[in-house]
């Protein structure tokens, strides 16, 4: 039994599982805490939820989480799963190393590469970008990458560039918005991202939030709006789809990692340790 949000997010990692029937409609979600706890955890949880509702953090996180989960089919998930088994293992350690070096979740870097090239290190676009992370020649030179078709150089260059974009964001933009805007800038260019922020600010909207900027980026394809900003026309829908896709791929890869790790841990436990673990569960949970 799962709630609708959990099903929406996790259905891709288990594409063979479907909805049998609904038990209730739109009931609130509750958190259960063991009776023997001293109240510290439940107090902090209630405090966080209250504050997150007041400053709309909860709303923003929910929108980010659900913005991509319904846009992908079982076929999309199957293709991603297949390539995650056949292509990703070759590059996994490089993604992990780059993630540690630049303080970026390696699943996110791997998701970027899947979005850019489907983990094809020979990928070449008609626009001139190429390689696993689809670097432009200018970006490759800036990141000191000599061979864009070398997958390991490409991972280094793309990771370094994303880290740079994230570092030069306005200091009042915090996570996760900081990384999400850096992703959009990686796709459409920082200048167009800043133009979208200007449009949002003119309307009195919070230009530090990705949930705001994703609504204004598409306006850059309309002359009424792009003619009033510095960097002009942009296909503003593309960076929105780009970020949504990467978030989906990242979530899929993280769930896949968790599932794999969980299965490994379970298989290594003997019956006695399982018995002890079960006996330790408070009867109130």
Regions inferred by a protein language model and the residue ranges of each:
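Beta->alpha turn/N-cap motifs
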Residues: 1-8, 105-106, 110, 136
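Extended ligand-binding regions for polar small-molecule ligands
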Residues: 27-70, 88-89, 240-243, 249-256
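Low-complexity, Gly/Ser/Thr/Pro-rich intrinsically disordered linker/tail segments
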Residues: 241-285
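Periplasmic-binding protein-like
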Residues: 8-47, 73-76, 221-222
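Catalytic and substrate-binding regions of cell-wall glycan-acting enzymes that process beta-1,4-linked
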Residues: 22, 30-33, 43-44, 180-252
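Substrate-binding/active-site groove segments that recognize
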Residues: 122-146, 151-164, 246
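A ligand-binding cleft/hinge motif common to bilobed small-molecule-binding domains
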Residues: 1-25, 194-195, 199-205
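Export/targeting segments at the very N-terminus of extracytoplasmic proteins
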Residues: 69-118, 152-155, 169-170
